[in-house]
């Protein structure tokens, strides 16, 4: 006998492991839901018979609105049902049903942020942000998201230098220690695969906030959400990924998510030394996604609904600064690119920006990158709510 959800499935004879469960306040009750699934390839196959807990007290007006939208069938997941993921590690974890449901909750979070500053959805929960690489938007948006939902934050600035990692402590030991202080860890690390290692030993949710040149799944979620809000659709779009495609984790995760949608075409525009890696191109081909490499940004911009610009990542070049200088400045979004773009199209950027988008572009309504950063708050509010209290 096999039970399944829209995202995962597992046979009942498979090994049953203890689910990750955080510390729960006494005024929480259990809502049972038979959900079984297999996680992605970085963790063992797991079956969970019990949902996460759902708070029943101190719901604000907007909190109650979320429950009403769920009862009205805005998305296909039941109120109180456990979120299908224990951790957010890579973009491949999400299917279209999950993405659509997350986006609906993100819209609810917009209402909470605007109309319900006293939300208590995550009251009693602690989130730890553990960042081994610099961050402004990702760290602050996660911390803002947690506090706007009534939760608390433990944070460390530059954990690579100012934590016990500087004394030689392993990532695994740090995770085991920090999980004793918190209910969820948001981790950024300089090594690809670090979030996967953390999730394998942690008993609480791990959110990958960027692992070296690997992935940045929450950024990809907010990017796709931004496209939906700005363009109005996700099927049938054309997206130009521009800049450092070899080292940029955001473009890798975004490519994985775009492959979930129909009739998407992706253009890769980059200097020769930072071209998109073959694993992404092979993945897109395997999913039937049309992609093309080009060196003509003007032509690509004229075709695309989205021009997604990225900076050349100097920190990934090590001592080969000659290669960095060779790549820098080759593809710049300026007035010439704006003139070539369609009127409905938008320019996106994960930020920070250096000189790859000229400042005069900011005044054009098609410059969506600061709106994109704001959408990230709502996506991260939605993720924290789902990981800690479920649908």
Curated annotation (Swiss-Prot):
Keywords: Allosteric enzyme, Chloroplast, Plastid, Pyrimidine biosynthesis, Transferase, Transit peptide
Name the UniProt record assigns to this protein: Aspartate carbamoyltransferase 3, chloroplastic
EC identifiers of the protein: 2.1.3.2
Residues that bind carbamoyl phosphate: 137-138, 188, 216, 219, 351-352
Regulation of its activity: Feedback inhibited by UMP.
NCBIfam families hit by this protein: asp_carb_tr (TIGR00670), PRK00856.1 (NF002032)
Role of this protein: Catalyzes the condensation of carbamoyl phosphate and aspartate to form carbamoyl aspartate and inorganic phosphate, the committed step in the de novo pyrimidine nucleotide biosynthesis pathway.
Species of the source: Pisum sativum (Garden pea)
PANTHER family, per database record: ASPARTATE CARBAMOYLTRANSFERASE (PTHR45753:SF6), ORNITHINE CARBAMOYLTRANSFERASE, MITOCHONDRIAL (PTHR45753)
Main location: plastid
Residues annotated to bind L-aspartate: 167, 249, 311
Protein family (similarity comment): Belongs to the aspartate/ornithine carbamoyltransferase superfamily. ATCase family.
Subunit structure: Homotrimer.
Class of the enzyme per the UniProt entry, highest EC level: transferase
Gene name in the database record: PYRB3
Taxonomic lineage: Eukaryota, Viridiplantae, Streptophyta, Embryophyta, Tracheophyta
Top-level lineage group: Eukaryota
InterPro entries: Asp/Orn_carbamoyltranf_P-bd, Asp/Orn_carbamoylTrfase, Asp/Orn_carbamoylTrfase_sf, Asp_carbamoyltransf, Asp_carbamoyltransf_Asp/Orn-bd
Pathway where it operates: Pyrimidine metabolism; UMP biosynthesis via de novo pathway; (S)-dihydroorotate from bicarbonate: step 2/3
GO cellular component: chloroplast
Binding site for UMP: 137-138, 188, 216, 249, 311
Reaction(s) this enzyme catalyzes, per UniProt: carbamoyl phosphate + L-aspartate = N-carbamoyl-L-aspartate + phosphate + H(+)
A single GO BP: amino acid metabolic process
Entry's localization field: Plastid, Chloroplast
Transit peptide: 1-69
Gene Ontology molecular-function annotations: amino acid binding; aspartate carbamoyltransferase activity
């Amino acid at each position: 006998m096999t039970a399944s959800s829209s995202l995962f499935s597992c046979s009942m004879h498979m090994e049953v492991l203890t689910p990750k469960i955080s510390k729960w306040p006494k005024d929480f009750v259990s809502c049972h839901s038979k959900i079984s699934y297999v996680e992605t390839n970085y963790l063992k196959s797991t079956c969970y018979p019990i949902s996460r807990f759902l708070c029943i007290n101190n719901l604000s007006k907007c909190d109650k609105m979320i429950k009403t939208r769920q009862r009205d069938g805005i998305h296909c997941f039941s109120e109180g049902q456990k979120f299908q993921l224990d951790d957010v590690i890579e973009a491949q974890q999400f299917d279209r049903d999950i993405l659509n449901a997350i986006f609906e909750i993100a819209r609810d979070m917009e209402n909470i942020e605007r109309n319900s500053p006293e939300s208590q959805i995550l009251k009693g929960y602690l989130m730890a942000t553990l960042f081994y690489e610099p961050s402004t938007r990702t760290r602050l948006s996660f911390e803002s998201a947690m506090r706007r939902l009534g939760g608390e934050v433990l944070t460390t600035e530059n954990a690579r230098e100012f934590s016990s990692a500087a004394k030689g402590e392993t990532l695994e030991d740090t995770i085991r220690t920090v999980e004793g202080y918190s209910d969820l860890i948001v981790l950024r690390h300089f090594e690809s695969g670090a979030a996967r290692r953390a999730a394998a030993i942690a008993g609480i949710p791990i959110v990958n906030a960027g692992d070296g040149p690997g992935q940045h799944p929450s950024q990809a979620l907010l990017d796709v959400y931004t496209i939906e809000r700005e363009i109005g659709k996700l099927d049938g779009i054309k997206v130009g990924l521009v800049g450092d495609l070899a080292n940029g984790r955001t473009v890798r995760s975004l490519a994985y998510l775009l492959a979930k949608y129909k009739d998407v075409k992706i253009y890769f525009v980059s200097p020769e030394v930072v071209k998109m890696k073959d694993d992404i191109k092979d993945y897109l081909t395997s999913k039937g996604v049309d992609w093309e490499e080009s060196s003509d940004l003007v032509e690509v911009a004229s075709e695309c609904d989205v021009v997604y610009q990225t900076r050349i990542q100097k920190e990934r070049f090590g001592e080969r600064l000659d290669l960095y200088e060779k790549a820098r400045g080759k593809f710049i979004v300026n007035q010439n690119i704006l003139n070539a773009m369609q009127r409905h199209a938008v320019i996106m950027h994960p930020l920070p920006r250096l000189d790859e988008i000229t400042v005069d572009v900011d005044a054009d309504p098609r410059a969506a990158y600061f709106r994109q950063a704001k959408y990230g708050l709502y996506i991260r509010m939605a993720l924290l709510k789902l990981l800690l209290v479920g649908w």
